[in-house]
């Protein structure tokens, strides 16, 4: 997910997106622990997307 896509969303939309990605990250971690995750690099991407969203939320609230 690109930061350009994220910065155009409202704070409420960002929070919903963050919640969805957090749930997806949780599921990916469970699958990875039992060996069913085919692409473990996906976890890193999800963590980075959540961090980008958190950054965008802080920037919007600071305005």
From Swiss-Prot:
UniProt-listed InterPro entries: Ribosomal_uL29, Ribosomal_uL29_CS, Ribosomal_uL29_sf
Gene3D superfamilies: 1.10.287.310
CC terms in the record's Gene Ontology section: ribonucleoprotein complex; ribosome
Pfam families the record matches: Ribosomal_L29
Keywords: Ribonucleoprotein, Ribosomal protein
One GO biological process term: translation
Taxonomic superkingdom: Bacteria
GO MF annotation list: structural constituent of ribosome
Name of protein: Large ribosomal subunit protein uL29
Organism: Bdellovibrio bacteriovorus (strain ATCC 15356 / DSM 50701 / NCIMB 9529 / HD100)
Gene that specifies this protein: rpmC
């Amino acid at each position: 997910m690109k930061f350009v896509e994220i910065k155009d969303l409202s704070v409420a939309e960002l929070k919903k997106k963050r919640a969805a990605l957090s749930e997806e990250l949780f599921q990916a971690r469970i699958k990875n622990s039992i060996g069913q995750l085919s692409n473990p690099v996906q976890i890193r991407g999800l963590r980075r997307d959540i961090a980008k969203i958190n950054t965008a939320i802080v920037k919007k609230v600071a305005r």
